[in-house]
Amino acid sequence: MAKIYKAKLITDTKIKTGKVRLSYPHLFEKYEKSGKYQCVLLIDKKDKDTLGVMKKAIEAAKEQGKNEKWNGKIPGNYAGPLHDGDDSDKEGYEGCWYLSAKNGQRRPQIIDLDKDDILDEEEVYAGCYIRASLRFFPYNQSGNGVGCVLENIQKLADGDPLGGGSSSAADDFDDDGEDDGEDDDLMD
């Protein structure tokens, strides 16, 4: 029987997701263009639990922004962190909501189901399934909106690689060859 990983509100603006899919991971080294550790999370539109918890945390961050950054009101040009994957042309995004989560201060800790650290970058790839701890925050620099900080990741399961990931050599050459019936002594 498969386990169900429930999303949870940890504080008003911090959550633990349910099972989500990883895309564009830059988790072991900072992404050169942004100078941050980051990834995109794909949340199945049927996962009402994760989406509900996430929306509560986003609303709390909006209220925080209204009170602390946006002069008592939510701006008309507010940018939210969730985007509709059906509007994207990226592989695997259909039927999902997606968001970008970043951390410029520290590398997220990445663990497996036994809560042991994952140190091999190839174990955590675009297409695998994870759950993540995230923190939402309001911002008013370069526009107004709610951003998402990536805290930590737990890998839950392997999945089909996204983005045309290459196959392994072992998979490409999984046959043992056939005996051609000839003598293998090439020096005769």
Report each predicted region and the residues it spans.
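A broad, structure-centric signal for solvent-exposed, well-ordered loop/edge residues
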Residues: T50, R106-P108, A157-G163
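Compact mixed alphabeta submodule
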Residues: D116-D188
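Serine/threonine-rich low-complexity intrinsically disordered regions
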Residues: S23-Y24, D44, D112, D120, ...
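Residues in well-ordered beta-strands of folded domains
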Residues: V40-L42, S100-K102, Q154-L156
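Structured, beta-strand-rich domain cores
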Residues: Q64-G145
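OB-fold ssDNA-binding interfaces and closely related basic DNA-contact patches used
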Residues: M1-Y98
